[in-house]
Every structure is written in C-alpha cells, then in structure tokens.
Amino acid sequence: MATALEGGKAATPRTLVVNGERFEHIKFTNFKNLEKPLTDILRSVNPSNSAVVFDIDETILINDPKIDACYHARPNPGIMKIYRLCLRLQIAVYFVTARRLSDENYEWTTKQLQCIGAGKYAELHMCPESYRVSAAKISEFKKRARARIMRKSKRQIVLNAGDQWTDTLQMSSIKECNAFIEKDNKSYWLFQPIDREVVWQLKLPDRGGY
C-alpha cells in the first residue's frame, strides 16, 4: 500500500490480523484527508471492469428523524462525493445493505436513494430475514453479496464502504464483532486486504447504522 497523507504528513500503513488474514490499513481522522487517496484510487482503475460497493444506512445517507425530506434521511456529503465520482468515471455502483429484504422495503429504499440523489446504480442487495439474527450473520451476508456481484458482473470490487466493521470485515462470532466495536469507531479506516477479492475496504465513523 502506498503511503497517504494524514494532516499533511505521510501516514504509514500498519498491519491488522483478522481470522488469520492480514490487512494493511491507514487511519484518517476526517474525510478531508481521506478524499484525495480515495479519488486517486478510483481514477487509477479501469472503469469497464471495476465496481464500488456502498452500504446505505449512515454511509450513503444519514438517517435523521428531525427532517421530513427523503423519508427522514439526508445524503452523507463525503460519501456522495465518492458516489458522484464513480458515476463520472463510469464505475459501476452497487448497494449492499442489512435492511430486510421485502417488496415493500425494496420499493421504499429505491425511493429514498432516488430522493437523496443516489438513484443511479447497477444493483441493490438487501438482507434476507434468515441472516438478520446476529452481526456475524449480517457480515456473512454482505461478504456473500460482494462475491455474487463480482461473479455475475465479471467486475473487480475496487472499494467497499460502510460504517460498521461488519460491512467491511468477515466476522465469525459475536465476540469477535464486539471486539471490533470497541476499537476506534470515530475515525475513517482504509484497508487493503492481503490476498482478498476486494481491493480496498473503507470503514466510516460509526453512526449506528447496520
């Protein structure tokens, strides 16, 4: 992994081990310092065989019960910048969410994405009820969804972003999930998995999404 700037200084990648798998990672304290590395990553890939995956809640949008617009949600400005850059570069966008899969939820979610300005995407993957029993099972669903996207589309996922550790890392148990929840959840973590299918993983500050 190349070094990236954090507050004007070169940030040195560190190694994290999860389930025996090694990840190079850099922590950013704010989106401003992260924006250029993300932009450089997306501009460096071939858009014809690349894809980006976003979580929905507290990632592409922020749920806010105090507002009436867009079904009580507003766009997340930083992630929307990355979303719009993907569209300009013609990189396929996919959404993978732990929202329960149903016809009603699907219709509501598509309307909400359209309302916040994120209505252009290749596919929306929602979570079957059988996976919504634990954080570990949700992480399994999301991993399977990403694998399915790459298999069907013949595209490489170059960036996968979400606000929960289960959005980005495969967790095998609730205990392991809880251990990660206790880590620094107020920073941005940019991971480069070693020998994994997704090129970059982005963990956003935890806003209580799923």
What are these regions (language model features)?
Residues R22-K27, P65-H72, Y94-R100, Y131-A136:
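Second-shell loop/turn segments in exported
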Residues I41, N63, I82-A92, Q112-I116, ...:
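Structured segments of extracytoplasmic/periplasmic soluble domains
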Residues S48-K66:
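Asp-based phosphoryl-transfer active-site loop
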Residues P47-N49, Q90, R155-I157:
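A general structural motif
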Residues L16-R22, L61-I67, L89, M126:
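Acidic/histidine-rich, surface-exposed loop or edge segments in extracytoplasmic proteins
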Residues I67-Y94, L101-E107:
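Short, acidic loop-to-helix structural element flanking the phosphoryl-transfer center
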Residues A2, G8-A11, E104-Y210:
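C-terminal cap/substrate-recognition subdomain and adjoining C-terminal extension
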Residues M1-F54:
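Non-catalytic pre-domain segments flanking phosphatase-related domains
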